[in-house]
C-alpha cells in the first residue's frame, strides 16, 4: 500500500493520536481483514489504489476535494458515502462520532496567530465559508480587530485551529485535551459571548475507510468485501 504523501501524513498521525487518546487496542476487524486479504489487491479501473483510512467518521466520508485535488479518473473510488445501514450510522454510539470544543476568544486568537503566522489581533468572528462533499469544511475565514485570514483545505484548517489550550468533549462525556490538529474538519462554529463553540463529528480526514466504521460493520456481520465496497465504491478485489 502506498502512503508516500508527505503533505498528508495526518492520516497516519490521526490513527496514532487516536490510539493514544483512547488507549485502544489494535482494531481487531482491520487486522482480520488484512489477514484475509493477503495476496489480494484492490484495483480501480485496472490500477492498484491507495487505500486512505482514518479513525472515525461523522456518518459521511469525503473526497479528495478536501485536500484541494479535483476528482478524476484515478481517484474516482474516493467518493462521499454515507456510513450507515437501515438502523442509522454505524458509528453513532462511538465517542468521537460527535464532539464539541469551547475555545476562549483570547486562546483562539493566540492559536491562529501561531498556526497561520499572521496576527489578526483579537478574533471577532470565525466561520466556515466553503464546504465540500459530506459536509467537510473546505475554507474558513477568521476576522480580527487587526485584519482577517482565510484558510483552505481540510488539513490546513485543522492545523489552524489546533494547538494546546482547550478541551474537546466527546459525545460520551469524556474529555480530550486539544492537540496539533482539530479532530476533524466536519464542523460548524457558533459564538456565545467570548467563546467560540466548535461542534464537530468524526476523527481524522474522512477520505476512504473509517477504521471504526469498518469495525462496527464487521461486528454486524459484514465481510471484508462488503466493507471495502462501502468505503471504496467501484473498486475490485483481485488476486
What function would you assign to each model-found segment?
Residues 1-239:
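Conserved, single-site charged/polar hotspot
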